[in-house]
């Protein structure tokens, strides 16, 4: 016997409940009343960001975005969208201040100056880390969820979206099912935002759950895809993937080969 489907109506439907989806919801909520986030993981789990350090690369006001972009062009041998990176960097300080306003605490020295760690041997690309170190991802998830709750953004977990619904050329919703009960779900919306990870091979931070549904949904609905050559692939040692090295090395961590050599 077929289960009766759940039907939801909203102004904006956001597929993906990680940090990107949360920020999309907060922005959408500035313009419309009803915003709904659906995620195939547990409700409010925070996506991959919840397992991050909660640290942040920021273009502080004393720097120029073009100078940071020049470093990235050098680092990536030019294989980067410079205009997109510059826009992200230009907006990064506003997001940094938003996080601080929500209660996210970035480390400072005794004089109150922000502490940072240079990235990949570059001078200006610096990340500003959460205090206490190592618990920032969980705290970022907590404060984003609190803000979503304050703004009455609805969230539903364990929803696997299988297809987007179109009305002519416009996307008007999505269909899927509840991953635990199998109940079909229909979501009707005036706008749909895809904020799901693209997936990859041998990813870290539980990326095995990111199967690329977001890109597949967009492609199935007629969207053009680009940068697919940069889908994530990690060829890393069997016993140690690289997570955390940026923070560990300044604290004295060492990498040794099989002979015990540094």
Q: What kind of feature is each model-predicted range?
A:
Residues 68, 103, 121-125:
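Glycine-centered secondary-structure boundary/capping sites
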Residues 78-82, 113-141, 199-202:
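Helix-loop-beta segment of a Rossmann-like dinucleotide-binding subdomain
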Residues 98-104, 126-131, 247-248:
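Short, charged low-complexity intrinsically disordered segments located at boundaries
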Residues 97, 119-120, 146, 216:
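Surface-exposed alpha-helical segments enriched in charged/polar residues
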Residues 75-116:
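Rossmann-like flavin
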Residues 1-70, 108-110, 132-262:
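Residues forming the flavin
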């Amino acid at each position: 016997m077929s289960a009766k489907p759940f039907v939801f109506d909203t102004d904006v439907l956001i597929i993906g409940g990680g940090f990107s989806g949360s920020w999309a919801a907060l922005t959408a909520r500035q313009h419309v009343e009803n915003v709904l986030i659906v995620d195939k993981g547990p409700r409010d789990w925070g996506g991959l960001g919840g397992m991050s350090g909660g640290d942040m690369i920021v273009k502080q006001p004393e720097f120029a975005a073009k100078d940071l972009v020049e470093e990235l062009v050098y680092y990536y041998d030019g294989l980067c969208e410079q205009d997109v990176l510059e826009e992200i960097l230009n907006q990064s300080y506003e997001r940094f201040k938003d996080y601080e306003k929500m209660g996210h605490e970035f480390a400072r020295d005794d004089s109150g100056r922000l502490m940072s760690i240079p990235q990949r041997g570059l001078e200006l690309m610096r990340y500003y880390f959460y205090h206490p170190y190592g618990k920032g991802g969980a705290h970022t998830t907590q404060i984003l969820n609190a803000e979503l709750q304050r703004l009455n953004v609805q969230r539903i977990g364990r929803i696997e979206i299988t297809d987007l619904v179109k009305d002519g050329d416009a996307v008007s919703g999505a269909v899927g099912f509840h991953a635990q009960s199998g109940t079909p779900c229909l979501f009707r919306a005036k706008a749909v935002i895809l904020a799901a990870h693209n997936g990859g091979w041998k990813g870290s931070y539980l990326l095995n759950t990111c199967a690329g549904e977001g890109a597949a949904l967009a492609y199935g609905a007629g969207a053009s895809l680009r940068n697919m050559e940069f889908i994530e692939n990690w060829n890393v040692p069997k016993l140690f993937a690289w997570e955390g090295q940026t923070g560990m090395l300044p604290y004295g961590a060492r990498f040794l080969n099989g002979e015990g050599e540094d």
